[in-house]
A protein has these predicted regions:
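Helix-breaking motifs and short loop linkers at transmembrane-helix boundaries and internal kinks
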Residues: 51, 83, 104-110, 138, ...
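Juxtamembrane intracellular "pre-TM" segments in multi-pass secondary transporters
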Residues: 9-16, 194-223
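Helix-loop-helix hairpin linking two adjacent transmembrane segments in secondary transporters
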Residues: 148-191
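Helix-to-loop junctions at the C-terminal end of transmembrane segments
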Residues: 72-83, 271-283, 368
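Cytoplasmic helix-loop-helix junction between adjacent transmembrane helices
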Residues: 114-152
Length: 400
């Protein structure tokens, strides 16, 4: 049952902390991030302990993320065909089993295989949290709750790396054991998560035809292209070349890199909680345009920061941009899709997000080799300019 809240004021919206469906849906983001954010800080330690190069050890991250690129659309189809909860619970159990197995893997090759299997289950998480929220809420409540998606991602980015680093002080295998909590979460979701399944699911041929029609009618291709370009530009700039800038230009430590990333995550988290208020003043298209312009300004400022503390302003601007952009794209897609199609629509968008992050290092590598981090940031800003061009081709929406 969808809640209709178009006429509610901000103060009349239900308390999100008392909404079990919302909390359980957002909890999926934590499990997605556990497999990345808790592992990245321990890669140098793993390299030393196992006597392997950092590049080879990084395969534990690639093995986890790659399945999502190819399998997320299929997971969305299954969620539309058989039901959200029917796909979620088995995926959670498989995730927990393979994740716990990673902590006990007797060899590096076995660890990679288990991470690959774990990544298969994560492909379903990437679509289900946004699909379920799109199913359950509408109007201002949907706007607010889509904003909480970015808030949760930001909180995970700020907290989980610290947790992984602290556990690694005891033993490098311990961060891999965190998915064991998925068993508890699966039990809670089984008992308390209410998800209305689509009333009608057509046969496969009709289903794919409807999806194709929906894409062109509701500017889906533009939104997918925006997701791909924005994720490539922002991930490459802030997750890959910002740390290089801090390390090379300012002799920054890993702790300083983490601190400046946390600043961006905190700003993103705060702004994403205010999306309802922002959407009462500006349309969704205007919010997207503003976020990409903020990205361009931020990326243009990065090479000229001068000092480590000079990075604070551009990184805060990147947080503002991130807090508005991703959730706004999800709102566009959710409103443009029916319940029977929403899983697949969100799945394709999630695949574009993962693909953008995967190709980011290669897109910015040549500019970096030619002119250092400055050229990498300029190239990333150019990518965001492309997002502005695409966003201008979206229909003007009403404020809510």
């Amino acid at each position: 049952m969808t809640r209709y809240s178009c006429g509610m004021s901000d103060s009349a919206l239900p308390n999100p902390l008392k909404d079990k469906n919302l909390l359980l849906s957002l909890g999926l983001i934590i499990f997605i991030q556990l497999g990345i954010s808790s592992i990245i800080p321990i890669l140098p330690l793993m390299s030393d302990e196992l006597g392997l190069s950092l590049g080879k050890v990084s395969l534990v991250v690639a093995a986890y993320t790659m399945p999502s690129i190819f399998l997320t659309p299929f997971a969305g189809y299954l969620a539309d065909r058989f039901g959200r909860k029917e796909i979620l619970i088995p995926s959670l159990l498989f995730y927990s089993i393979t994740g716990t197995g990673c902590a006990l893997a007797p060899s590096f090759s076995m660890l990679i295989w288990l991470r690959l299997l774990q990544g298969i289950s994560v492909a379903t998480f990437g679509v289900l949290f946004s699909t379920i929220i799109g199913d359950l809420y509408s109007g201002k409540e949907r706007v607010r709750n889509m904003g909480y998606i970015t808030t949760t991602f930001s909180a995970c980015t700020a907290v989980i790396p610290l947790a992984g680093g602290l556990l690694a002080l005891i033993h490098w295998r311990l961060p891999f054991a965190l998915p064991i909590f998925g068993f508890v979460y699966a039990n809670l979701a089984f008992k308390h998560l209410y998800v209305p399944n689509p009333n009608h699911t057509p046969d496969t041929r009709s289903y794919l035809a409807n999806i194709k029609k929906s894409l062109f009618l509701h500017h889906g291709l533009i939104l997918y292209s925006i997701t791909l370009l924005a994720s490539a530009g922002s991930f490459g700039a802030y997750q890959i070349y910002m740390p290089k800038l801090v390390n090379v230009a300012f002799s920054g430590s890993p702790a300083q890199i983490g601190s400046i990333l946390t600043l961006s995550a905190l700003v993103s988290g705060v702004i994403s909680t205010q999306l309802v208020a922002i959407n009462t003043l500006f349309s969704k298209r205007s919010m997207l345009l503003a976020s990409f312009i903020l990205y361009i300004i931020s990326m243009g400022m990065m090479p000229f920061a001068g000092t480590y503390w000079g990075l604070a302003i551009p990184m805060a601007l990147s947080g503002l941009a991130q807090g508005m952009s991703y959730s706004t794209i999800l709102m566009f897609l959710s409103e443009a899709s029916s319940a029977a199609q929403r899983g697949s629509i969100m799945a394709i968008n999630a695949s574009m997000l993962t693909l953008g992050q995967s190709i980011a290092p290669y897109i910015l590598l040549l500019p970096y080799m030619a002119g250092g981090t400055a050229w990498a940031f300029i190239t990333a800003a150019s990518i965001m300019a492309g997002c502005v061009w695409l966003a201008l081709r979206l229909p003007q929406t009403h404020r809510q």
